[in-house]
């Protein structure tokens, strides 16, 4: 049966069906195109999101072992050397601390002795307010090497003490 054999109504019906089907296909394609456009509007962000970034890079085990051996050969001795220096400095500081505490104790004992001596003499002639008499300064000068005192400082101490005594005498005369 050919198309000529079919009645005219049926032919138009088939043609209508085809056009309807074609229209529906066009609608579906338009909707698909619209959905695709909406989806692809954000494509720049999506490409950025979906792109892979290399965060970690794999290196061969030989390179890793080589880096470890270089570290142990170069860095570890330097660290040990610095650690030894710090330990030596710590020991020096501890000895210095004990030396200074012993000196402080000795000075405190001397101060107490001078205060006792001052109370006995009741402000005697050779005793000043610092607790050092002429004899004490002479003893310091003779034992300066043993105690580590500076000679110039001791002479300056004697000079200043004498100057103070003269000034006190002058003030007493004026009053």
UniProtKB/Swiss-Prot annotation:
Record-linked InterPro entries: DASH_Spc19
This protein's UniProt keywords: Cell cycle, Cell division, Centromere, Chromosome, Chromosome partition, Coiled coil, Cytoplasm, Cytoskeleton, Kinetochore, Microtubule, Mitosis, Nucleus
Coiled coil: 70-122
Mutant phenotype after disruption: Cell cycle arrest in mitosis either with unseparated DNA or with unequally segregated chromosomes. Abnormal spindle morphology. Inviable.
The UniProt record lists the keyword Coiled coil: yes
Gene Ontology BP annotations: attachment of spindle microtubules to kinetochore; cell division; filamentous growth; mitotic sister chromatid biorientation; mitotic spindle organization; protein transport along microtubule to mitotic spindle pole body
Gene Ontology cellular component list: cytoplasm; DASH complex; spindle microtubule
Keyword Cell cycle: yes
Signal peptide interval: none
Record's subcellular location: Nucleus; Cytoplasm, Cytoskeleton, Spindle; Chromosome, Centromere, Kinetochore
Pfam family, one: DASH_Spc19
Family: Belongs to the DASH complex SPC19 family.
Complex formation: Component of the DASH complex consisting of ASK1, DAD1, DAD2, DAD3, DAD4, DAM1, DUO1, HSK3, SPC19 and SPC34, with a stoichiometry of one copy of each subunit per complex. Multiple DASH complexes oligomerize to form a ring that encircles spindle microtubules and organizes the rod-like NDC80 complexes of the outer kinetochore. DASH complex oligomerization strengthens microtubule attachments. On cytoplasmic microtubules, DASH complexes appear to form patches instead of rings.
Entry function: Component of the DASH complex that connects microtubules with kinetochores and couples microtubule depolymerisation to chromosome movement; it is involved in retrieving kinetochores to the spindle poles before their re-orientation on the spindle in early mitosis and allows microtubule depolymerization to pull chromosomes apart and resist detachment during anaphase.
Protein name: DASH complex subunit SPC19
Origin species: Candida albicans (strain SC5314 / ATCC MYA-2876) (Yeast)
Underlying gene: SPC19
